[in-house]
Amino acid sequence: MTEISTHYSYLYNILKDIASDNELSPLLLFKGGTSLMFFHDLPRFSVDLDFTLIDKEREQFVYDRLLNLAIKYGKIVDNNLGFFGPKIVLSYGRGSWNLKIEVSNRYWGEKADTLTLDGFSLNVMSLSDMYAHKLIALEERTGVATRDIFDIWFFEEKKVSPNEEIIRKRKERSLLEQLTVDISILERFPNNRILSSLAPLLTSDSVKWARTHLLSETISSLQRRVSSERVNQRFKKGTSITPPKGNKGLKR
């Protein structure tokens, strides 16, 4: 088995174990790149399992349960119940990727879709909420993660609208303001670094495309969304869009 197929099998089996735990599963919202890969056909590989904890009072229980679950699959090389929630890092073999399970205890009222894979079901964060968090992640990470750029492009390709309410709760700014921040970050990002850490997660054809198109297409997509958002705001305020003077119609 290749490294990707081996890692995929570990991700799959751990998710199946979580789904079969009737006490653990309802407390978790599956999110992030791996959820997009499993349930929404994200065209890149993702190596970690990310969740949001719905009930912070059950944090210790969730941490202990995940630790007992993960230890069946290999060696725990790092684990802690940190300020922002549980983290467990699993190593299952020499030369392989580590598998990180991370649970955020910051619940912002995100919506969930119950989605089914091969007979087991998980609560998966809505695409709209995930996209809002992804726009914020681009800004908040220490250094730009190129997988965030790829995922933003993916959300735009699927015509997902980010949930502005999440952005307002987390950043106290509008969607338009967040988009402006992100475009500025992307415009400063050097294109020759676009494949940094991203290339191993893509097919060879996708690597060729990403090298020349990913950054520019992502910027263009966000710029289009900014234009659309400005029009939406004008209509919300009751401002009509009038044609220029002297353009009252075609003369025959």
Label the model's feature ranges.
Residues 1-28, 39-42, 53-252:
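Structured mid-to-C-terminal alpha-helical surface segments
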Residues 30-34:
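Glycine-rich beta-strand-to-loop/alpha-helix junction loops that act as flexible
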Residues 45:
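Conserved donor-binding loop and adjoining core beta-sheet/short helix segment
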